Amino acid sequence: MQNEHSEFAKMSQTLTNVQELRLRASTTRHALSDIVREKDWSDFQFAPIREATVSRAMTTRYFEDLYRYAVSDVVIVGAGSSGLSAAYVLAKNRPDLRIAIIEANVAPGGGAWLGGQLFSAMIMRKPTHLFLDELEIPYEDEGDYVVVKHAALFTSTVLSKVLQFPNVKLFNATAVEDLVTKPSANGGVTIAGVVTNWTLVTMAHDVQSCMDPNVIELEGYKDDGTRDPKKKHGVVLSTTGHDGPFGAFCAKRLAALDAQHAIKGMQSLDMNTAEAGVVKESGATAGVEYMYFAGMETATKKGVSRMGPTFGAMAVSGIKAAEEILRHFAE
């Protein structure tokens, strides 16, 4: 009998809640409530505009960005979870740095829009939850790990925060085709920038000839192209992942330039060794000045195991690489 009363009470409360929601719906308020007649949108109009105005508004701003970021302090190649995490830490701590993010896809975020096997939830092992706390992303605490209800919640949140920084520009649908290099005084390679093109052009080089690229130069050079010792040299952080047409691109390009930077290849799945390994191996590259790696590109380059559908190392490796880059600019 007691259980029946309990169930009846729950049903009554549910019905009451539904009635309240219906009552609220009858007087719904939204952003346009003051300019739209209730239940009648027949007189709704947008402000007038000329087609050329739209074109000029887009064009001028994009080319202003191209001009401003033609010389950048930090170029991040790949806007996946590690690249975006690094961008957040860098932009937050150094608002004076010009940070260009180059993403080959139209949609940034890499593989972090879904969890494993196209499922929704994102699993992150502790202590990555501290980064989620900073970003104010809710999660379920399961002891040693946390669960974000949908991977897209993490990606959209960090992406939104990164894009709001005034010193960050995302160039999506843009591919890095090559690296700009110069001889190093110590006999290695100095990274001086990246070579860019529209992604669709890059992928069409086999069907059309003579489609030359553009460049983004790293800060640190005079107008004649020689090194300016008065300026802090910029850096490239490559976070291009391991899959797709541009996976591990910068690691592969370095290997092609110099055999000592040969790719070891990503090893089979082992979550416990993989995540710690990716974080430990992320950061600066020996023998290559001003070049940093993070995320799954690190696993491919250094021969670390893959971790599969657990994302803590993606964020943390980006944070670690960002910390090293911040030290570089602080020296």
Swiss-Prot record:
The keyword Nucleus applies. It is found in: Cytoplasm; Nucleus. The modification 2,3-didehydroalanine (Cys) is found at C210. Pfam families: Thi4. It comes from Eremothecium gossypii (strain ATCC 10895 / CBS 109.51 / FGSC 9923 / NRRL Y-1056). The keyword GTP-binding does not apply. SUPFAM superfamilies: FAD/NAD(P)-binding domain. Belongs to the THI4 family. InterPro entries: FAD/NAD-bd_sf (IPR036188), Sti35 (IPR027495), Thi4_fam (IPR002922). Involved in biosynthesis of the thiamine precursor thiazole. Catalyzes the conversion of NAD and glycine to adenosine diphosphate 5-(2-hydroxyethyl)-4-methylthiazole-2-carboxylic acid (ADT), an adenylated thiazole intermediate. The reaction includes an iron-dependent sulfide transfer from a conserved cysteine residue of the protein to a thiazole intermediate. The enzyme can only undergo a single turnover, which suggests it is a suicide enzyme. May have additional roles in adaptation to various stress conditions and in DNA damage tolerance. It comes from the Eukaryota. Homooctamer. One of its GO terms (biological process) is mitochondrial genome maintenance. Its cofactor is Fe cation. This is Thiamine thiazole synthase.
